[in-house]
């Protein structure tokens, strides 16, 4: 407990930053515009980043912000036309977007400055592909010893927007910046009501993607801070650097530092939940918590999480958002995998002097399986095969050149193998590869008005085989099982590529 309070005091001593004056600097908005153009994530919305940057309009915006009545009228009249320019909708939209993008950069500055206080020995290599959603690999590779139950947690929605501002007060004591944050939240949503659905919550993401990431990241960091604090005390972590791979779906940066709670509330419950075998991971607005103990202890955890949300966020989390499942019978959809936890027997031969004996040890570990039915259904909707998995031609692509057809089929196959490289059983992937290969051949044969056999004899199956198995070198982590006969490409080999930033479209067509 003393260590936790010491960390809290250190965080509080680094929070005196005043960044509000930067909003009156022209270079800030140019930087925000360039950041949007260089963003490596797919463009999901139409924002000011898709418009031509105008330094003249930025100067006009800064001049208007210097006016005393600018912010007063904005608060009293939160309509978009009255906010910035009621005569010209383009000016109004441009001002709103560029100002919110600039403000997003401003509020991130205190967090960036605080990273300079981190000890050098704890620095993590800055690989460009550490943003991968497969940063959950450390959880999937954990050995679950003496664990019987999993807690599936849905991170609570809705939240009141004022809670977001209050959470940032721990890190940003620049009062004008906090007031401006309230202004943006008031402008982008209905301030006097709760956000009652995920669709409404992501309205803020549609308006300003970067600001949404920052606010959501801060909120979730506070939500899981106490869990990560307990997890760091564990002596059973599989990787020393696993703390650096905290899962962040579609976030531009990973954050190691978390907000501070009331130590008095923590002291009363910390003793009951000190567990050196805690396993925690978050993905797609959900989280999984696994630790040793009985069903009674898991129910205690469930009600503790409910009370924690009510105490820390002034928000009542419905108990039905936390599901308790027995580990042996747990099978769930996990980032495009069907994950289960089978008990694998392991025979170990021990020998003492002249006597030898066998020890039967059962290891508990996540088994990641490719969902064959789901993927075949997705290929069927995309008109690559029938509902039963029989390959068919794709007539809409027959107007393309032969190279474009091969390239499209090849990219789909590569993406499937690349994304599901962490699967422990890859036979389903080879079945999907067969479907795509034959569908490609049927499409080319239909284009040239010949049979598949004739076309394959003329083109050669070797070229197709090499084309579909070509793989670009990327940074990856491999966790292989100990076998007497090992070769690359084994069905039991699990490779976690660290350049995957979103879910494959065939796995989750909605994302």
UniProtKB/Swiss-Prot annotation:
GO BP annotations, alphabetical order: mRNA processing; RNA splicing; tRNA processing
Alphabetized InterPro entries for the sequence: Domain_X (IPR024937), Maturase_MatK (IPR002866), Maturase_MatK_N (IPR024942)
Lineage: Eukaryota, Viridiplantae, Streptophyta, Embryophyta, Tracheophyta
Protein name: Maturase K
Annotated family: Belongs to the intron maturase 2 family. MatK subfamily.
Known role: Usually encoded in the trnK tRNA gene intron. Probably assists in splicing its own and other chloroplast group II introns.
Predominant localisation class: plastid
Organism: Brachypodium distachyon
Recorded GO MF terms: RNA binding
Name of the encoding gene: matK
Subcellular location(s) per record: Plastid, Chloroplast
GO annotations of cellular component type: chloroplast
Keywords: Chloroplast, mRNA processing, Plastid, RNA-binding, tRNA processing
